[in-house]
From Swiss-Prot:
GO molecular function: ligase activity
NCBIfam families in alphabetical order: thiol_BshC
Coiled-coil features, chain-numbered ranges: 450-485
Alphabetically ordered keywords of this record: Coiled coil, Ligase
Family: Belongs to the BshC family.
EC code: 6.-.-.-
Enzyme class: ligase
Pfam family, one: CC_BshC
Protein name per Swiss-Prot or TrEMBL: Putative cysteine ligase BshC
Record-linked InterPro entries: Bacillithiol_biosynth_BshC, CC_BshC, Rossmann-like_BshC
Keyword Ribosomal protein among UniProt keywords: no
Organism, as annotated: Flavobacterium johnsoniae (strain ATCC 17061 / DSM 2064 / JCM 8514 / BCRC 14874 / CCUG 350202 / NBRC 14942 / NCIMB 11054 / UW101) (Cytophaga johnsonae)
Length: 529
């Protein structure tokens, strides 16, 4: 194949907002702090160092040690946790939901982007330490988003009821799920490794948070990854003043609404609530609403006066859960973080938040679009070569691709533009004639031109359809290849689970990705495995 990457901007899978951000358009410059280049991290380090409350490092390290108590920990991860106590240590963070068996492939790419960036930063700034962090979205309550994964075109769903924060959800019932999934995996060495990984992850851990920590640790512990569950009372102590301001002043709502006004030319990713906090218990996560001088927990009978809710916050900060607007702030309060790495949708909502961070005097992190990858087998790459297709061709929407290939391989031109030009010339003569006679004739000429031009356009469409039928065998091979690489006409990384590729590559998969991906290059990578 002629190239192994294409730009995000030309891939066709990124919004105008993200494309303009990547192009560093001037109208977006007020919405972020520093654009993520290796050189710009020097400024970000200085700003975070002067703004971060280093007392929060103690709670952070103690909490992480507690959370890692019952898990085998690598020397590199153990060292990174200890390093977080030092004032010259900073984090690079990504976050992800607790998707069953990691969910879509981009789970890997997020974490690999994070690990690789810490390596690049250590090389550039050796007097500092950089720790890769995976923030587990344990407080999310939308179980339907995470209770399945796709494997070889089939959806494997865990049917279970859940209302509260998913991190606290029991893993009971996943033994039966594994029985069904195992049948699809087969009995190869790599298949047996995957079965054991699933079993050790979900059948030996009581809740989804512990299970997901084990899974991510199994895949990435050797690279120093630190996994955090922020659904924790000690960590939330540092968040109390900001949650208090949110309850009393609705600062985030006002600031984000102003930013959304700036973004009106784009699709807005997230709209803020007046209060961007939830109230949580084991089986409950509902919005806090302020009405008539009282605070209500939505869909419950729970209510508080102002004094009562502030007392509840002081005594039980773990019962207050930030939503998508407040969670980034919580993250930046408890972590000495320099950069958040996320997908296009995440970066879009981070771009709404800088004015809010400024209002509460917290340094806004750099925001980096994660690595995106298309994994292709050698057989698929060879097939693309035989069909004379570039990777850019394969990223084209299917209808457009089929039309373009039909034009390309047709034995004769399908484009009737020359005939349209001849027609236009003929009618030009008639218009000149019409100018010398009655106006009604000029109208008749115009009507006839429209009719005949439309007729040629219809013939052109019918000719294209006829050639598609005539070339159906060749076109079907193109369609089949694209469908293999883009399941459900979507990006592979949003559809397929890592286990599909682990079956082929086994333990080589993660090291291969770590070796190939460069976090700051911001290209869509095509990797042949």
């Amino acid at each position: 194949m002629p190239t192994d990457c294409i730009s995000y901007q030309t891939s066709g899978y990124f919004s105008k907002l993200i494309q303009d951000y990547l192009d560093q358009k001037s109208e977006l410059k007020t919405l972020y702090n520093h654009f993520p280049t290796l050189e710009n991290f020097e400024k970000q380090i200085a700003e975070k160092a002067s703004n971060f409350d280093n007392h929060n490092r103690i709670a952070l390290v103690n909490t992480l040690k507690k959370q890692y108590q019952n898990i085998e920990i690598s020397d590199s991860t153990k060292q990174n946790i200890e390093l977080l106590a030092l004032e010259n240590t900073f984090t690079i963070t990504t976050g992800h939901q607790l998707n069953l068996f990691s969910g879509p492939l981009y789970f890997l790419y997020k974490i690999i982007s994070t690990i690789n960036l810490t390596k690049e930063l250590k090389s550039k700034y050796p007097s500092y330490n950089f720790v890769p962090v995976y923030w587990m979205a344990t407080e999310d309550h939308d179980f339907e988003e995470i209770n399945y994964f796709n494997f070889k075109g089939k959806k494997f769903r865990w049917n279970k009821e859940s209302n509260g924060p998913v991190g606290r959800l029991s893993t009971e019932g996943l033994a039966e799920f594994l029985d069904i999934y195992s049948l699809e995996l087969g009995s190869s060495t790599n298949a047996n490794t995957l079965k054991k990984l699933f079993e050790d992850t979900y059948l030996k851990h009581d809740n989804l948070a512990d299970a997901t920590r084990f899974l991510a640790n199994s895949l990435f512990a050797n690279y120093g990854l630190v996994i955090i569950d922020a659904d924790d009372a000690d960590l939330k102590r540092a968040f109390i003043p900001y949650a208090k301001e949110e309850l009393e002043k609705q600062t985030s709502y006002k600031a984000v609404q102003e930013t959304i006004e700036q973004l009106k030319e784009y699709t807005v990713q997230v709209n803020p609530r007046e209060i961007n906090l939830f109230y949580i218990e084991d089986n409950l996560r509902e919005r806090i609403i302020f009405e008539e001088d009282k605070y209500f927990v939505n869909n419950t009978k729970i209510s508080f006066s102002k004094d009562q809710i502030l007392s509840e916050l002081e005594n039980h900060p773990e019962k207050f859960s930030p939503n998508v607007i407040m969670r980034p702030l919580y993250q930046e309060i408890i972590l000495p973080n320099l950069c958040y790495i996320g997908g296009g949708g995440e970066i879009a909502y981070w771009l709404e938040l800088k004015s809010f961070f400024d209002a509460v005097n917290i340094t806004f992190p750099m925001i980096l679009v994660r690595n995106s990858v298309l994994l292709a087998t050698e057989k698929q790459a060879k097939k693309a070569d035989q069909l004379n297709l570039s990777w850019k061709d394969l990223f084209t929407k299917q209808e457009n691709l089929v039309n373009a290939i039909t034009h390309k391989i047709s034995a004769f031109p399908i484009d009737l533009t020359p005939q349209k030009e001849i027609l236009k010339t003929q009618f030009q003569y008639l218009y000149e004639l019409a100018a010398q006679t009655d106006k009604s004739f000029s109208g008749a000429v115009k009507a006839q031109e429209v009719k005949q031009t439309k007729g040629l356009e219809n013939l052109e469409k019918r000719l294209l359809k006829a050639q598609k039928r005539n070339l159906s065998d060749q076109l079907q091979r193109v369609i089949d290849l694209q469908c293999e690489l883009f399941p459900n006409n979507s990006l592979q990384e949003r559809q397929s689970n890592f286990s599909e590729f682990y079956l082929e590559k086994g333990e080589q998969l993660v090291p291969l990705l770590l070796q190939k991906l460069k976090p700051l290059e911001m290209n869509f990578n095509i990797i042949t495995i």
